[in-house]
Amino acid sequence: MEPAVSLAVCALLFLLWVRVKGLEFVLIHQRWVFVCLFLLPLSLIFDIYYYVRAWVVFKLSSAPRLHEQRVRDIQKQVREWKEQGSKTFMCTGRPGWLTVSLRVGKYKKTHKNIMINLMDILEVDTKKQIVRVEPLVSMGQVTALLNSIGWTLPVLPELDDLTVGGLIMGTGIESSSHKYGLFQHICTAYELILADGSFVRCTPSENSDLFYAVPWSCGTLGFLVAAEIRIIPAKKYVKLRFEPVRGLEAICEKFTRESQRLENHFVEGLLYSLDEAVIMTGVMTDDVEPSKLNSIGSYYKPWFFKHVENYLKTNREGLEYIPLRHYYHRHTRSIFWELQDIIPFGNNPIFRYLFGWMVPPKISLLKLTQGETLRKLYEQHHVVQDMLVPMKCMSQALHTFQNDIHVYPIWLCPFILPSQPGLVHPKGDEAELYVDIGAYGEPRVKHFEARSCMRQLEKFVRSVHGFQMLYADCYMNREEFWEMFDGSLYHKLRKQLGCQDAFPEVYDKICKAARH
């Protein structure tokens, strides 16, 4: 009884403090209090609910039957929109705060919202090595199911809450992408509802133009209702090597060399300054040396990026065996390194042991509760960007990141970009090795001004035939955007499929003016 009374007294005192200081003051200056007391427990409840729901639905095998009914319901909504005169564009009815992007699309308030309640794994076919899923299936769901039966996705992007739909309509990448490409490159079929309410299935050999145009289109060619994705046999552990490297030239040379070695299942780099990095290479294995086993995903363990930094500080190489699912979600608990700005003591051993089992808070709930003042502060004093540049331009790109934003750590993830039709492809006719440079945090450059600094960075990326991930703030104008992306197939299909009066152009959904 006494703990309950103490908790009630603490809650009452907190509410009185909020009343005196004001909710906005607390959310901005002591946000960790609000996050720890409210968002962490709420996030845990969300996770438990969705995990239990997904398990029950899959065990009852009810998803395929429900799927057909839900698809018919989406078609009905689209046809009703047409019958009512097609007065506004359509978009999915999923609230903007539920997405992993830091911004919320303004268009949700003005467009016709089509409700798409598709969040289940439909089928796992181990003979064909295919998993068929609905668009709102998360990476957490996928790993929980596939890893338990000895399978995995060739490319399994990091954060638990990333969805299949977002990774196809936007993009997705992981440390295995040097072998398999982006998330779109492991997909074998898409099922969509088009602007006229019709259903279409597209593959590399059937409706191939649409198949190659869908990735990066952000839902502006149709509504994704299912996808078929390759699966491969999984092993229990990742044998991960850590190697600190100093000097930018040595870093780029080592990273490129390891990315070209296809015997590496995983390649990743964390850059802690312009000339200090730890490069990690891994292979899947069923064998383990017990003394080197590290269950890094356990709630009481140090955050992964801090653990990696120790190899740099002590200037030693290392070898560890990490459980496969722990490896896949190694950056989830700390949201890469963003959580250190929200809960500054989050990596403290005492906090980890007492409350680490509730971490991380849902990104969606962080967005929902941030408020207008905090949103503006984040916009001007916080950067979240992923720029994809050719590997040969890596050194030049890192100098540009240093000069324009100066954010560390920086995430380095290699990927092979095939020469295929669509919005994103290499400049030449052959596949090319690229690197994703991810910068997340507070810029340290003097007199940082978000718009001018980001436009300068975007200009550099265009000049080397690179690409910007579309979840991030985009300051390019329309002409610059279509200089970066190849819109030839995309515009052809928008006209051919009647999308011009049904969906906004992709630029109008992702540009800075379209989000808040």
UniProtKB/Swiss-Prot annotation:
Its cofactor is FAD. Catalyzes the reduction of the delta-24 double bond of sterol intermediates during cholesterol biosynthesis. In addition to its cholesterol-synthesizing activity, can protect cells from oxidative stress by reducing caspase 3 activity during apoptosis induced by oxidative stress. Also protects against amyloid-beta peptide-induced apoptosis. Residues 23-31 are lumenal. GO terms for biological process: amyloid precursor protein catabolic process; cholesterol biosynthetic process; cholesterol biosynthetic process via desmosterol; cholesterol metabolic process; male genitalia development; membrane organization; negative regulation of cell population proliferation; plasminogen activation. Residues 1-22 form the signal peptide. Belongs to the FAD-binding oxidoreductase/transferase type 4 family. It comes from Mus musculus (Mouse). Residues 53-516 are cytoplasmic. It comes from the Eukaryota. It catalyses: 5alpha-cholest-8-en-3beta-ol + NADP(+) = zymosterol + NADPH + H(+); cholesterol + NADP(+) = desmosterol + NADPH + H(+); lanosterol + NADPH + H(+) = 24,25-dihydrolanosterol + NADP(+). The lineage of its organism: Eukaryota, Metazoa, Chordata, Craniata, Vertebrata. The chain crosses the membrane at residues 32-52. Its EC number is 1.3.1.72. FAD binds at T163, V164, G165, G166, L167, I168, M169, G170, T171, G172, I173, E174, S175. Gene3D superfamilies: 3.30.465.10. PANTHER family: 24-DEHYDROCHOLESTEROL REDUCTASE, DELTA(24)-STEROL REDUCTASE. This is Delta(24)-sterol reductase. The gene is Dhcr24. The keyword Membrane applies. Keywords: Cholesterol biosynthesis, Cholesterol metabolism, Endoplasmic reticulum, FAD, Flavoprotein, Golgi apparatus, Lipid biosynthesis, Lipid metabolism, Membrane, NADP, Oxidoreductase, Signal, Steroid biosynthesis, Steroid metabolism, Sterol biosynthesis, Sterol metabolism, Transmembrane, Transmembrane helix. It is found in: Endoplasmic reticulum membrane; Golgi apparatus membrane. Pathway: Steroid biosynthesis; cholesterol biosynthesis. GO terms for cellular component: endoplasmic reticulum; endoplasmic reticulum membrane; Golgi membrane; nucleus. Pfam families: FAD_binding_4. GO terms for molecular function: Delta24(24-1) sterol reductase activity; Delta24-sterol reductase activity; enzyme binding; FAD binding; oxidoreductase activity, acting on the CH-CH group of donors, NAD or NADP as acceptor; peptide antigen binding. PROSITE patterns: FAD_PCMH.
